[in-house]
Regions:
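N-terminal intrinsically disordered, cationic/polar leader segments
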Residues: 2-114, 118-164
């Protein structure tokens, strides 16, 4: 036996609330370089790894937004580059029922957090396939990155003070 409900469409739509669903996760661009292979001369210990992470977003349609997590890594032993990795881990997210700060929160914080696990696995796999021990991306606080970006935008938009 099935249960029947007599709800009008407007009431049903009101109950669904905001919707956020990943539609696709993909590598938009990727590059791994090991200029000297895994046998870098005169290296002892672990290399120093410089990490830069950035995000960017763009609407693809009215309800679908692309979020790109850009990860750049450079491993160096002294002045020698051991390996370089550039990754653009992207996702298309269906987002409906959100606007303003809520939409900004999803595309700048929630979506990059979702993509980070995929990026972490890709980075570890590429480094291992390059002949090196795996590198695990650290936890990233996208809330702090977003807050810093907003502060920088506000500072750039503020009028410069003049001294007479």
């Amino acid at each position: 036996m099935t249960e029947q409900t007599n709800q009008n469409p407007a009431a049903a739509a009101a109950q669904t609330g905001p919707i956020v669903n990943p539609q696709a996760v993909y590598i938009k661009d990727c590059s791994f370089e090991a200029p000297n292979g895994p046998f870098v001369a005169n290296t002892t210990g672990n290399p120093t790894v410089n990490l830069n992470i950035a995000t960017r977003t763009a609407p693809l349609t009215q309800d679908v937004h692309e979020v790109v997590l850009q990860v750049n890594l450079e491993a160096k032993a002294g002045d020698k580059v051991v390996w370089l990795l550039e990754l653009q881990q992207a996702g298309a997210f269906f987002i409906r029922g959100l606007a303003g700060n809520d939409l900004t929160h999803v595309v700048n914080i929630v979506a990059p957090n979702y993509l980070m696990g995929f990026a972490r696995a890709t980075v570890a796999d590429l480094v291992v396939q390059g002949g090196f021990p795996p590198f695990l991306l650290p936890l990233v606080t996208f809330e702090a990155l977003h807050a810093r970006a907003q502060q920088q935008q506000a500072a750039a938009a503020a009028p410069a003070s003049t001294v007479n």
